[in-house]
Regions:
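Active-site/ligand-binding-proximal alpha/beta "capping" segment
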Residues: 82-131
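Intrinsically disordered, low-complexity regions enriched in small/polar residues
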Residues: 4-5, 11, 49, 62, ...
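Glycine-rich loops and low-complexity Gly/Arg-rich segments
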Residues: 35-39, 61-65, 87-90, 106-110, ...
Length: 157
């Protein structure tokens, strides 16, 4: 498996169950110019027809690893690892380094406690009070494009 420290935004997906969500996340990740995706044991199948349909086949342009031990991967990465949850600094206020990893969790349970402990910082997406949470695909899009806004799009202006 890939354990070097390639450049860019590394997406770590913890037990994502819905193929539609996974497809949307992959499509967004590729659209923002990113390459690396790591799926934990328990994630839905990267190659299922519904994931391929939802991603529009973008997993063919990504470097994807399935059945990964994300805790071991985090131990080997040499850059910041963020998690997304309900508490923490707003992702919109955080100045990112170009090379980061971001953990997104299961649709119902969120990120496992093991991975939360390994995260350098939890960030949140600001929402009005009567909205409990966002769909993981929507949340991923916000995080991915905030990182892209700070690097990819600034460099191309």
């Amino acid at each position: 498996p890939y354990y070097s420290n390639g450049a860019g935004f590394h997406l770590l997906l913890d037990d994502i169950q819905d193929p539609g969500n996974l497809g949307a996340i992959l499509r967004t990740h590729a659209a923002a110019g990113n390459k690396f995706v790591f799926l934990s044991k328990g994630c839905c199948d990267l190659w299922s027809p519904k994931v391929i349909r939802g991603s529009q086949g973008t997993q063919f342009s990504l470097i994807c690893y399935q059945q990964e031990d994300l805790a071991l991967l985090i131990d080997r990465l040499e850059f910041s690892v963020f998690s997304l949850g309900m508490q923490g600094e707003s992702v919109l206020n955080r100045k990112f380094d170009q090379n980061i990893a971001f953990i997104l969790g299961n649709e119902g349970r969120g990120i496992s406690s093991t991975l939360l402990k390994k995260s350098d910082q939890m960030l949140s997406i600001p929402m009005i009070k009567n909205v409990e949470s966002l769909n993981v695909g929507v949340a991923a899009s916000i995080v991915i494009y905030e990182h892209a806004r700070q690097f990819l799009f600034q460099q191309s202006l």
